[in-house]
Amino acid sequence: MIDNCILDEQIFDHYVYQKEYLLLAVPKSYSVNTRLQEYQIPIETIHDGSFLSPEVLSVPLNSFANEPFIILRSDNDTGKRALTICQENNFTPHTIFRLDQQMTAYNIACSGMGITFIGDLLLASAPATSELIFYKLPGKNCNRNVSFYWKKGRYISRAMEEFLKIALPQ
């Protein structure tokens, strides 16, 4: 199994696959974007990872305090982190949708209905859009590990060993 949350180490073994960084995806039609142009990051910098440079500024998140948000459910790691990040930036998001999946939130944001939090790994494989503007988020809660998990004590097949050798960075 692959997941972006921490599972019980008493039950599961894991290998870290890679880091994922959450970003803010804002419909381009929102007027708040005009005041925050210096913080906007092109999708190309997300794809190549250069947005992680310290020179790329994190957006003052409370600038979006009065905007509608699409937030994942609180039992979802992305949903928990989104609420924590907003709390750390001194506001509670005006939530118009509570969803289960990042891809659904992304598609609704593309339609212009609200702002959402999205992982850079998903953006790497999502259909390209010109309907969203992306922003780097402040704080430590915007990054997490994505890991391969399996139950402790279970047999690891030769095929699984070879897959992990290929998939995991050396």
Predicted feature residues:
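Short secondary-structure boundary/capping segments
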Residues: 13-16, 38, 60-62, 87, ...
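Conserved beta-strand segments of alpha/beta enzyme cores
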Residues: 13, 68, 92-95, 133
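Structured helix-beta-strand junction loops
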Residues: 20, 66-67, 89, 111-112, ...
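Secondary-structure junction motif
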Residues: 32-33, 39-89, 156-158
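A late-sequence structural motif
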Residues: 120-122, 131-170
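Hydrophobic hinge/microswitch elements
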Residues: 74-130
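Short beta-strand-centered segments that line the small-molecule binding cleft or hinge
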Residues: 1-43, 133-135
